[in-house]
Amino acid sequence: MATDFPAEISALRGTLEQITAVTDPDALRARIAELSEAAAAPDLWDDPDAAQKVTSRLSHTQSELERLDTLRSRIDDLETLVQLAAEEDDADTLAEAEAELTKIRTSMGELEVRTLLAGEYDSREAVVTIRSGAGGVDAADFAEMLLRMYLRWAERKGYPTQVLDTSYAEEAGLKSATFEVKVPYAFGTLSVEAGTHRLVRISPFDNQGRRQTSFAAVEVIPLIEQTDHIDIPETDIRIDVFRSSGPGGQSVNTTDSAVRITHLPTGIVVSMQNEKSQIQNRAAAMRVLQSRLLLAMQEEENAKKKELAGDVKASWGDQMRSYVLQPYQMVKDLRTEHEVGNPSAVFDGDIDDFIEAGIRWRRQQQTVRESATA
């Protein structure tokens, strides 16, 4: 069936106008002016961390505005291309228009998903922790596979990351790993990845070649900001120091530079060992602890709302995705039903479709809960 280009182009323009109304270009321009002024301050780089946040937010906000303008221009160009194909009755030009229509739909979908990230902390940078679960050495290996998957995803998108802590398992893989994704909206984007991930495969660590099911947990928290005012009394924490370790339990540092902070009232434990000094690891651990406490407060509030709605199960993140390598190959999200038959691509960071489906699914769930309490 021939593509109805006028209808498609009209629909694209309508969607873009809806996105524009939500995004508010005037507000973006005002934010760009504000950040540009901050970026021009002569003392900006006196605090490198704060300076990096300012420049990152400026670049991101400029990119948001540019994407709106670029999409509008691409739709105009597509309309011109379709007219040219009709005038010249050129099949090649028509095929080019079909291809461009597909690309614009994809770009529009990505931009539309961004408008769904309207949660209180969605615009924050993210701290991601991966922990091996049941499954022994296979689970530890799976945790390392997931770490590589997320770092590759960030690398492909040009997002800066920093690995804060890695705790290696004895035989292979990781007990746990924590890293930051230093870009605005990283939390809103990656929070749909939180939950239990399951791997099914023939174990490379089993001499009998048996199929093994293993698990890993992914936690995603918003990075704390100075304006959050999360005060932690010294009496509420216990700080332990130890030597950083590498694969197989080998010590990689001759000094006690690694830090473990335990928040006594909640039992939350944060370890950091990838910075060079104990002071740096302590500062990083405190920042992550504050972020986890911030998220815990939000989750407590969300639990109250769910109880009012008659939904006492806060389990959307549990058992969220299966990665099956044998006897067949399939990666499937158990919430959204989105699935692909190429696990290799997924483990190489090709997870945008899963994330987009998760964000849309989450918004649908929120709408249902809001309707139940209306």
Curated annotation (Swiss-Prot):
Q: Which InterPro entries does this one have?
A: PCRF, Pep_chain_release_fac_I, Pep_chain_release_fac_I_sf, PrfB
Q: What is its main location?
A: cytoplasm
- List locations, semicolon-separated: Cytoplasm
Membrane spanning residue stretches: none
What does UniProt say on post-translational modification here?
A: Methylated by PrmC. Methylation increases the termination efficiency of RF2.
GO molecular function terms listed in the Swiss-Prot or TrEMBL record: translation release factor activity, codon specific
Q: Name one GO cellular component term.
A: cytoplasm
- Entry superkingdom: Bacteria
**The entry's keywords:** Cytoplasm, Methylation, Protein biosynthesis
Q: Which residues carry this modification: N5-methylglutamine?
A: 250
Q: Which Pfam families match?
A: PCRF, RF-1
Q: Which family does it belong to?
A: Belongs to the prokaryotic/mitochondrial release factor family.
Q: Briefly, what is this protein's role?
A: Peptide chain release factor 2 directs the termination of translation in response to the peptide chain termination codons UGA and UAA.
PANTHER family annotated for this entry? CLASS I PEPTIDE CHAIN RELEASE FACTOR, PEPTIDE CHAIN RELEASE FACTOR 2
Per its record, how is this protein called by name? Answer: Peptide chain release factor 2
Lineage of the species this protein comes from: Bacteria, Bacillati, Actinomycetota, Actinomycetes, Micrococcales
Gene encoding the protein: prfB
